[in-house]
Amino acid sequence: TSRGLGDVYKRQVPACADAGIAAFTGDGTNPDVFTAASAAIGAAGGRGIPTVKPWDRDTLFAKLDSAKASGAKVFAMDIDAAGLPFLKGLTPPAGSKTVAELREIIEYVKVPFLIKGVMTATGARKALEAGASGIVVSNHGGRVQDGVPATAQVLPAIADAVKGLMTILVDGGIRTGVDVCKALALGADGVLLARPYVTAVYGGGAEGVRLLTQKLKGEL
């Protein structure tokens, strides 16, 4: 529920910031989800990354205003979410974005902007052309399209295309510090983990987040 997520964000966002990492918060068809995320980031002094879905223009810019009010220093959009089955045919609609549309969004927020869901070198170059500060190489856990390659398979080619020109992050099955090391060796500048931190914050709150981060750093 949105209330449950709001409670999680209240614990997750400051706990991650205190552990020296940044929490990416989510978005959904229920507008309260993004509102709760923005509120949690605002309460943590802007130390979190609000991640918005590729909605229609009016919905998107209203959500961007909410995120701007939080004081967030970095924004993100999971561009591949346009293909999620649960967003199909909904109001508000979500869909793909052109380079020009992304450029307008990035110029509007006036802070570094990450585009999540990039799986090709061509997509990475388009993100760079749009003015993105970074990308997240991600297949959305395989939930957008069947048969997509693993992120580790496509990461080297993407790194060859844009390494040094923008920040390259990657997610997908990263569970240990050794996995982090592999991602860095394949060309990433950093990684994202979702499920382990969800488990940590539910099971141990801020202490769970701290211990997991400490464990990953030690393994790395």
Mark where each language-model region is.
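PLP-dependent amino-acid enzyme catalytic core
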Residues: 7, 14-18
